[in-house]
Structures are given as C-alpha cells and as structure tokens.
Amino acid sequence: GYMVILQAADAEAERARVTGLGVRVVDELDSGDYRASHFHPADFGGVLTSIDQQRSAPDYLEPYGDWMPAGPDWRDARTADVLDLAAVTILSADAPALAARWATLLGTPPSAADPLVLPLKHGEIRFEPAAAGAPTLVAAITLKVADPAEIRRRALAAGVVGSDGAIRIGGVRFDISG
C-alpha cells in the first residue's frame, strides 16, 4: 500500500501546522464541505499521507458521518461484518526513525509501552522493521470484525489467503480480530 488517510477536526489548521514543519503539499482538495491535503511522500518517509476533514460531519470521530470521497450513498454498502479499522502498519527499514518522524508530523506522542506505535483518537499507526534497503510501505490494515472465523472462511473462498495463512489483497495484509 502507498497511502494513509487521516481525519482531523480542522484539516486547514493541520495543513498549516504540517507545512510549518517543512512538509510539502502535493495536492489540496477544498470542495464544498470537504478539505484534504495530500503531503509529499518523501516528507513522510515514503508514504503518501492525507489529512482530511468533512465539515458537514460535526464529530470527525463519528464512524458513520458524511465522507465525500465515498459518495452520498456509501452507507447503503456498509456491512455489519467490519466493526472498526483498528490500525495501519507501516513497514520501514528504519522503523524507529520513521515512527519518531510521524510522531512529530502528526503531533502525536508515541505509546509509552511501544515507541513504534502512535496512538490516535480512533486507532493507531504501527511501524515495523523491514530489511535494509526495503521500500517503506503500508504493510497491513487491522480490522476489528464481528466474526473472525467467517471472515477467514470468505477470504479462503476468495483465494486471498496466502501459504503463510495471512489474508492479502493488493499486496496489503489484512489482520482481523474479534
């Protein structure tokens, strides 16, 4: 994977704060009630990162609020199977340095228990070491699901479970928990 999208209470304030740290914006989308800033991957250690806001959703932590990129009818496609997106895992040859960089860029201190984890208000970003010279990438998404056994059964039927037992779609590992 190549991109992490985060929601904020005030995307324009976050844009100003992050660019004030020397990070370049590669795209801004300010359309109606929606604000988004895509930051240069090189400035985020190799991952395209976007900080977005949907102004018509008064509480950005509300999981079923408006979200313009998903279209007006996204709720109709929602399923009761997935309860939450719990974490994103980024693989990096220098995971400690990248975790520290992201902590600065996001204004989020690392977990006291694990400096490779950045706790967010609704989930976390995890950093895992990769082999020297390996590219930085989004390696995994952790989903909290209603029935992990059923999700695994469907993944097997869809042929997206590898020989290592991991569910992978588009090169990204999907970790599931109940």
Language model segments and positions:
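Aromatic-enriched hydrophobic runs in primary sequence
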Residues: G1, A11-E14, T19, W74-R78, ...
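A generic short-segment signal for beta-strand/edge and adjacent turn/coil regions
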Residues: I5-A9, V18-G22, R55-D59, A87, ...
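Surface-exposed interaction/gating patches
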Residues: G71-D114
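Vicinal oxygen chelate
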Residues: G1-A93, K121-R126, A132-G178, ...
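Aromatic-residue detector
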Residues: Y2, G71, V82, W102-L105, ...
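Intrinsically disordered, low-complexity segments enriched in Gly and acidic/Ser/Thr residues
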Residues: P96, A100-T142, A146, R152
